[in-house]
C-alpha cells in the first residue's frame, strides 16, 4: 500500500535537516535557508496532491526478460554520487540538482497534471542560457585541494574544447560558477541570473572526470537522461524497489521546462542515472535497459558520450560558428573550434572521421578488419600482462573496426575470452565496448562471458570495438562475416543527422 505522507517533509529543522543545510549552504553560498525550504515545499506539495494518480504504479514487477539479465555481481568498490548525496537528498531534485523557484513551479505543475509529451532534456528558458560570445566565468573555492582543482580543470577544458562555449577563471565576475567543496556532488541547472554566482559542488569524491563533466553539464543547462518524457520506451523504472520518499527523483520532465533537441535516448550518456539509484534493496536494479546488452552502459562516469557533446552543441547552436559544414563520416559533426575539420565519435579520428584511432593501451593490436562472406577469426589484445596495478579512474583504450563492402551488413560474435574471472557489473577492470553502427551513441559494455557466441548484426557495413583496460591485459577472440543487407540503401545509422 502507498501512503501519501511519505512525500511530505515537515518544515522543522531537525538534526538531519540541519546537517543537510550545513552541507549545502556553506559560507560562500548566496542561496538561503528560506529559498531552499520554499523550493522543497513546492515539490513536496505537488507530490502530495498527485498521490491518488500514482496508486497502482508501485510494486509492479519488471518483465522477466529484463529482470533475468546476467551482468555479474554488483560493483561495490566505488560510491556513486547518488550515494554520496544521501545526506542532502531532501533538498535536491534527482539527487544532484538544485532547483530555482521557477523551475520548481514548472515541475510541480507537471507532477500534478502528468504533462509529458516531448523528448526534452535541456533548458528552454533563455534567461538560463549562457552566452557563446562571453566566457562562462568561474572561481575555485580556496578549500579545494590542488588535486581537486587539477581534476576539475580537465572537465572545464573538455567542455571548452568540445563546444562553442568558452570558460575563463575570474574571481570577481558576475554570474560566475563557484566550484566548491560543499557536501555532495550537485549543481544548479543553467545560468542563475538572480545570483551573483552559483555553486557547483565538485569536492573530494565528486571531482572525477566523469562526475565533474556531469555537474558542469547541469550548469550548462541539461537535465538527466532518464527525465526525458519518452524514457519509458527505453528503460523500465521499478517503482517497487524505489524508496517511496525518493520516488520524485524519477519524475519525467515537463514539456515546457526543457528544450526539444531531437536527440535519441543514449543509455551511456554521462547524464544517465546509476541503475541502482534510490533502491530499497540495493542488490536489485531500479532502472533496467529495455534494449539487450545496454544495462552496463547506464550510469557510466568515464566521460561524456558523443551524444552529450552533440546535445551541448545543438543547445547553443554551435554549428552557426562555421559558415560551411564539413561532410563528416561515421556520425561526426563540424568542429566549431576548427571549421575545417570534424569532431569525431571516440571510435574514429582524422579530419573527416574515417580513420582508426591509434589507441593508448600498450601492446594494442588495433586493426581494420575486412569482412567477407566467410567467417573470419581475429584474436585481439591490449594492455600489459605484467602489470598488476590498477586504477578505476584512468583507463587505456584500443580500437578495432570491422568493415564490409557497401550495401552489406556484418554478423559478429565473440568466441573466446577470459572475461569470466573479471565479470562484474560496470566492468571496473577490463571491458569491451561494442558499437554496431550507431556511432553517435554509446555502445554495449561487456566484461562477462555470457556474451559468448551471441550473434549481433551491424546497422550498416561497419562495427567499432573498443577495449577498455584499467588492469593487466585484455584478450578476446571474435568471428565476423559479411551478409546481404536487409535495409534500404538510403538508411542512415547516424541518429543525430
UniProtKB/Swiss-Prot annotation:
Coiled-coil region list: none
Cofactor binding summary note: Binds 1 zinc ion per subunit.
GO terms for cellular component: extracellular region
Keywords: Cleavage on pair of basic residues, Disulfide bond, EGF-like domain, Glycoprotein, Hydrolase, Metal-binding, Metalloprotease, Protease, Secreted, Signal, Zinc, Zymogen
Gene Ontology biological process: molting cycle, collagen and cuticulin-based cuticle; proteolysis
Propeptide residue interval(s): 15-120
Amino acids binding Zn(2+): 214, 218, 224
Cofactor entry: Zn(2+)
Disulfide links within the chain: 164-318, 185-206, 328-339, 331-342, 344-353, 364-398, 427-447
Subcellular location: Secreted
Main subcellular localisation: secreted
Active site, renumbered: 215
Domain EGF-like: from-to ranges: 324-354
Name under which the protein is recorded: Zinc metalloproteinase nas-28
Originating organism: Caenorhabditis elegans
